[in-house]
């Protein structure tokens, strides 16, 4: 249980990644830069860790947002809460330099969302929920595969509303053909099975359909894998 590990005073759980000790770990910061370190060089879980800033050199004011581990050809969704994203291979996330490299261009006022693993670029779908209670589900195949950039528009949100933090993508997940998607709103949750999700299918770049009352202030989503 990573959230139950021992942390230094003032520290708390942020993100975790599962992998093997002979693999590199990729870290993504708030400016869209990525950094990679050999997993076996990181401190063991018996201690309280060490600052990442001692191993890599992020820009001033940047904060680390996520960590991922995978195989070179594994596909991931890179996106921002401005509603833009693209597909990238794990090998293209890795950076040899201490200063890392820019992979994701972040629009003004937008925030980086955690990379999401894609099992099948042909069959999987992307589910986005906005802070205004709209859900949009469309095929991963409608997004380009890139090594860096801003990506394509996934959900229609005016840039000015993102910059003012009035409207933005609250969360994004990748769902398989038979997967179920659970939405969390306060103490309530709503599970949408594969058939239920069809109501929210739409073309990439649309606004999405309104969720039922009581579930229009979604905090987060999770995927229940089937098969």
Sequence positions of predicted segments:
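Short, structured "edge-of-domain" segments at secondary-structure transitions
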Residues: 1-227
């Amino acid at each position: 249980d990573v959230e139950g590990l021992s942390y230094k005073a003032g520290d708390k759980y942020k993100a975790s990644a599962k992998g093997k000790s002979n693999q590199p770990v990729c870290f993504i910061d708030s400016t869209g830069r990525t950094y990679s370190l050999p997993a076996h060089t990181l401190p063991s879980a018996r201690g309280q860790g060490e600052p990442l800033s001692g191993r890599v050199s992020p820009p001033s004011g940047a904060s680390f947002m996520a960590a991922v581990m995978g195989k070179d050809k594994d596909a991931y969704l890179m996106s921002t809460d401005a509603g833009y994203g693209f597909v990238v291979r794990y090998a293209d996330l890795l950076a040899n330099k201490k200063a890392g490299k820019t992979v994701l261009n972040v629009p003004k006022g937008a925030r980086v969302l955690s990379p999401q693993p894609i099992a099948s670029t042909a069959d999987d779908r992307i589910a986005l929920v906005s802070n205004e209670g709209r859900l949009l589900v469309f095929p991963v195949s409608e997004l380009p595969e890139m090594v860096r950039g801003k990506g394509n528009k996934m959900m229609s949100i005016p840039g000015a509303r993102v910059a003012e933090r009035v409207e933005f993508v609250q969360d994004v997940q990748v769902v398989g053909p038979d997967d179920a998607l659970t939405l969390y709103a306060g103490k309530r949750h709503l599970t949408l099975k594969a058939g239920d999700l069809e109501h929210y299918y739409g073309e990439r770049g649309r606004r999405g359909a309104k969720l039922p009352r009581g579930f229009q202030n979604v905090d987060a989503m999770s995927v229940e894998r089937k098969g």
